[in-house]
Swiss-Prot record:
Compositionally biased residues, Basic residues: 28-37
Residue ranges with Polar residues bias: 172-181
Identification of the protein by name: Dehydration-responsive element-binding protein 1H
UniProt biased composition (Low complexity): 10-24
Manganese is among the record's keywords: no
SMART domains cross-referenced by the UniProt entry: AP2 (SM00380)
Major site of localization recorded for this protein: nucleus
Source species taxonomy: Eukaryota, Viridiplantae, Streptophyta, Embryophyta, Tracheophyta
Annotated GO MF terms: DNA binding; DNA-binding transcription factor activity
Region (Disordered): 1-43, 155-187
Record's GO cellular component terms: nucleus
Protein family according to the UniProt entry: Belongs to the AP2/ERF transcription factor family. ERF subfamily.
Length: 246
């Protein structure tokens, strides 16, 4: 009886160990979910058929070909999203048979119907559609660049023509004109001449230089006059001498 109970307990414990090991194995090797784990949105939020390409900030254009399931038409890479959107409009106009063929509803810009010169092309000739779209976009960008350059040049001409010379400043005497460089130089020359005239004084009166130097020579040859008698020779030493006598 005891042996039978012991066998039952051992079998139940072994089955419990096997079930726990199998459950731990299932938890360890859990199956990964299928599908993409990371999705990066590159489509432009506004323009149709435009998406970003790479980290350089360039934009590509790709449109669906109407009437062909899964067919797409590659239109190239552009610097700006607006240019890629214009390429999309040009391709849709060409594929729809012109601006009045129902392609105006799929345009990114409504003015592309008359700004883009796109000839109608057959949807089967995708190479011709691509060529017509790229030529139309290139012509539009060239015209837009020329127009913007001309407007900028006109604005620059107007700005420069409106600039005039500043009015002359009034001097302290109330005159409306300031003396020019020539008048300033003339005033300086006049002042310098007056200063020189101040030093050219007539020290000798009617006497010329020859007579003046001759008189100096005669003065050197003459004997000097006798010296005046000193006061202490009069014998009045120690006496008070009045400076003034009335």
């Amino acid at each position: 009886m005891d042996m039978a109970g012991h066998e039952v307990n051992s079998s139940s414990s072994s089955s419990g160990a096997e079930s726990s090991s199998s459950s731990s194995g299932r938890q360890q090797y859990k199956k990964r979910p299928a599908g993409r784990t990371k999705f990066r949105e590159t489509r432009h939020p506004v323009y149709r058929g435009v998406r970003r390409r790479g980290g350089a900030g360039r934009w590509v254009c790709e449109v669906r070909v109407p009437g062909k399931r899964g067919a797409r038409l590659w239109l190239g890479t552009y610097v700006t999203a607006e240019a890629a959107a214009r390429a999309h409009d040009a391709a849709m106009i060409a594929l729809r048979g012109g601006a009045g063929g129902g392609g105006a509803a799929c345009l990114n810009f409504q003015d592309s119907a008359w700004l883009l010169a796109v000839p109608p092309a057959a949807p089967s000739d995708l190479a011709g559609v691509r060529r017509a779209a790229t030529e139309a976009v290139a012509g539009f960008l060239q015209r837009n660049k020329t127009t913007n350059g001309a407007s900028v040049a006109e604005a620059m001409d107007e700005a420069t023509s409106g600039v005039s010379a500043p009015p002359p400043l009034a001097n302290n005497a109330g005159s409306s004109e300031t003396p020019g460089p020539s008048s300033i130089d003339g005033t300086a020359d006049t002042a310098a001449g007056a200063a020189l005239d101040m030093f050219e004084l007539d020290f000798f009166g009617e006497m010329d230089y020859d007579t003046y130097y001759a008189s100096l020579a005669e003065g050197l040859l003459m004997e000097p006059p006798p010296a005046a008698t000193a006061l202490w020779d009069n014998g009045d030493e120690g006496a008070d001498i009045a400076l003034w006598s009335y």
